[in-house]
Amino acid sequence: MQLKEFGVSLGDLIHEFNFEVVYGPEGFEKTEITKDDVNRPGLQLAGFFDYFDPNRIQIMGKVESSYVEGLSSEERRSRFDRLFETGIPVLLLSRNIDVFPECLAAAQEDGVPILRTNEFTSTIMSVIVAFLKVKLAPRVTLHGCLLYTSPSPRD
């Protein structure tokens, strides 16, 4: 019995949910998502990274955008630099949020794709998690052989 881990490519997610590509470095569609959960990076944009899992899809909604909007340009760049340096697979902007120039510059520097959707943050979070739970569910592959033998007649 062998348990195999699975991944979902960003290209598959873009196709499945019709995400807009705001920025995508060369070959980003092949990036594999291996975690079946997502994160809203509000605490990380405020500077708190304890227990942060950088392997999750990061979804930035209106709350995070409003917080970042109140920062100076230099501080915005610093916060996005710190987030992208962790190696997150993608930043997804919900509600058709405009990308901050500082966010785009930091993403380009670190090669982090930025996607966008018009869906509400909570809606797209739940839909993505449900999709990933199915696609990344553990599976077992068994190899077997069935052999039938008839009893030999005894005298």
For each predicted feature, which ranges?
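Short secondary-structure boundary/capping elements
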Residues: 71-75, 99, 139
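Short internal beta-strands
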Residues: 91-94
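Short, surface-exposed connector motifs at secondary-structure boundaries
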Residues: 84-89, 108-111
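Pre-Walker A adenine-sensing motif
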Residues: 137-145
